[in-house]
């Protein structure tokens, strides 16, 4: 239980921290990657939600 709680805290903290504070800007050559970089902090949450979808698919055995 502690591991799941820790994972939730880490995911939420990383998503909140990185989306609320911007200290750096990508160089001009990589400006087209801005939408992908903005989405990257949310990716761990997708894995967390995938675990529930997977468990629902196997009927929470």
From Swiss-Prot:
Subunit structure and binding partners: PSII is composed of 1 copy each of membrane proteins PsbA, PsbB, PsbC, PsbD, PsbE, PsbF, PsbH, PsbI, PsbJ, PsbK, PsbL, PsbM, PsbT, PsbX, PsbY, PsbZ, Psb30/Ycf12, at least 3 peripheral proteins of the oxygen-evolving complex and a large number of cofactors. It forms dimeric complexes.
Swiss-Prot/TrEMBL GO biological process terms: photosynthesis
Topology in membrane: Single-pass membrane protein
Membrane-spanning ranges: 40-60
Matching InterPro entries: PSII_PsbK, PSII_PsbK_sf
Gene: psbK
UniProt KW keywords: Chloroplast, Membrane, Photosynthesis, Photosystem II, Plastid, Reaction center, Thylakoid, Transmembrane, Transmembrane helix
Family: Belongs to the PsbK family.
Main localisation: plastid
Location of the protein in the cell: Plastid, Chloroplast thylakoid membrane
Organism whose genome encodes this protein: Daucus carota (Wild carrot)
SUPFAM superfamilies referenced in this protein's UniProt entry, alphabetically: Photosystem II reaction center protein K, PsbK
The protein's name in its UniProt record: Photosystem II reaction center protein K
